[in-house]
Design a protein with these regions (language model features):
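Short acidic/glycine-enriched loop/turn segments that link adjacent beta-strands
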Residues: 51, 135, 247-250
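Residue-level signal for inorganic ion chemistry
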Residues: 34-37, 59, 70, 103, ...
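Small-residue (primarily alanine) positions within well-ordered alpha-helices
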Residues: 23, 27-30, 62, 128, ...
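N-terminal subdomain of lithium-sensitive/metallo-dependent phosphomonoesterases centered on the IMPase/IPPase/PAP
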Residues: 1-100, 266, 273-276
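Generic detector of well-ordered alpha-helical packing
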Residues: 60, 83, 99-102, 106, ...
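DPxDG-like acidic metal-binding loop motif
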Residues: 89-148, 163
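An extended, acidic
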Residues: 155-276
Length: 276
């Protein structure tokens, strides 16, 4: 393939590999910086949308490191970051960055926080990395290339009965919304194995991908929360959609081991009917 000026362009697979290499390098650098900083102590913690929606100096420093790294490696790409990064581009590639997904866990020194970097083209996620520094775990995927944990292939669980499913979810920063969501879960918790709440969407998606949980659902997220994780889950054989089974979107996402998607979708939809 050649560009208009005659230069050879990378194939889709080559491009995905290049994007993955950039993302992996930057996720490791940013995550290790944040981990070292957390061990040294936090000095600048502020609130965002609510009194419980936090941002630390390391959220911002991580995003700056990643944005500068992407701009140096791929200056024509667009970038969108949780902490305000917004760079327009001309290449057709857009990066979605969550510099620390699970900031509350980071604040409390719980290990379930991650750096999430996804690169998308017009067809959706093309390459994704979720790095969990406190666990030393790097989840990676490229479109059509499979999903990996520290270089080893991963796949979702082979579970067929939703009553045996360990299900993860997340709750809103809004107290009113949290109450509605908790009531919803209470309506079907007796019909599944149990509920877990990790506190980081990117990690939840990766844990479905590698079989540590069987399903994950949440609402009112952003593209930077799910861009990398949903690709990793897809490449690991998971099924994703909104709660009713249509195209997954940040406003509403359900990702499961493939055989239980419809069963869990029905439980969530039935439980949600009572709060509308």
């Amino acid at each position: 393939v050649q560009s208009e000026n005659g230069a050879n362009l990378p194939t889709a697979d080559q491009l995905a590999s290049q994007l993955l290499q950039v993302a992996t390098t930057l996720a490791k650098q940013a995550g290790d910086m944040a981990l070292a900083g957390r061990k040294a102590g936090l000095h600048n913690v502020q609130t965002k949308s609510t009194a419980t929606d936090m941002v630390t100096e390391f959220d911002r420093a991580s995003e700056v490191l990643i944005v500068e790294g992407i701009r140096a490696a791929r200056p024509e790409d667009a970038i969108v970051g949780e902490e305000g990064a917004s760079v327009s581009g001309t290449s057709g590639i857009t990066w979605y960055i969550d510099p620390i997904d699970g900031t509350t866990n980071f604040l409390y020194d719980l290990p379930a926080w991650a750096v999430s970097i996804g690169a998308e083209d017009s067809s959706g996620p093309l390459a994704g990395v979720v790095y969990i520094p406190a666990l030393g775990e790097m989840f990676t995927a490229t479109r059509g290339g499979g999903a990996f944990l520290n270089g080893a292939p991963i796949q979702s669980n082979n579970i067929a009965d939703v009553s045996q499913a360990l299900v993860c979810t997340g709750f809103s920063y809004s107290a009113d919304q949290r109450t509605i969501q908790a009531q919803r879960v209470s309506r079907f918790i007796h019909q599944i194995r149990d509920i877990r709440r990790a506190g980081a969407a990117a990690i939840d998606l990766c844990f479905v991908a590698c079989g540590r949980i069987d399903a994950y659902f949440e609402e009112n997220l952003h593209q930077w929360d799910i861009s990398a994780g949903i690709l990793i889950a897809h490449e690991a054989g998971c099924r994703s959609g909104d709660f009713s089974g249509h195209t997954p979107r940040p406003a509403e996402i359900l990702t499961t081991a493939p055989a239980i998607f419809d069963q869990l979708s029905q439980l969530i939809m039935a439980a949600s009917a009572s709060d509308r």
